[in-house]
Amino acid sequence: MLTEFDLHLFGEGTLHRAYDKLGAHRRELDGRAGVHFAVWAPNAEQVSVIGDFNGWDPRTHPMRSLGVSGVWEAFVPGVNDGHRYKYEIRSRVDGARLQKSDPYGVFFESDASGAAIVWDLNRYTWLDKKWMEERPRKNGWLDRPLSTYEVHLGSWKRVPERGGEPLTYRELAQQLVPYVREMGYTHIELLPVLEHPFAGSWGYQVIGFFAPTSRFGPPEDFKAFIDACHAHELGVILD
């Protein structure tokens, strides 16, 4: 749950890990497992969390306002990984009811619905400790040559047997990463890989700044792709 100090830091713009407090996070409250939802909606008269766990009914789980902070929160027991959700917001300006995506969502549906998915990011264990420890010494761009391979993951290679679908993160780790290393590059620069609604775009219309696009797999598969890059001594740059 958000503390008064969290809200103070958020209000002054210094809650640097706000993504750990806002969004959807699995918690336990009074012995009940569930998910804590929090969203900043300063001009809302009312906010509810809606999802497939309550029939998308805004009357079921209204959120409580945390005063002048503009933050709303709710704890919903029984919600778990895989449940989809949005926020329904009633404006205090004109009374309009709007369904909004979670700006702190970490995983989204692959269609353009904008629904986020509750997901535990701790299910993956990073394997790049050695790379991270040596990065300042071995990967400094100021004192050594840098050669970057810029790529759009969705169009690098297609799979005819799957109707022309792009490679998954795991497949890219097996095919793209060794290719880039073999070609002598030091870095991979990914054209926008954060969640966006239109698959035919380059990805600059971002709706989820904390979520790698689900078009190529879940968040842990993206982490595995990054791990593969680091295992091949390749730095990663996000466009």
Language-model features, listed with the residues they occupy:
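Short proline/glycine-enriched turn/loop motifs at strand-loop junctions of beta-rich domains
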Residues: W40-V47, W56
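Short amphipathic alpha-helices and their capping/turn segments at secondary-structure boundaries
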Residues: R135-K138, A173-G184, I226
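Short beta-strand elements bearing conserved aromatic residues within extracellular beta-rich modules
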Residues: V47-V49, Y85
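Aromatic-lined carbohydrate-binding/catalytic grooves of carbohydrate-active enzymes
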Residues: V159, G164-L167, P178-A224, L234
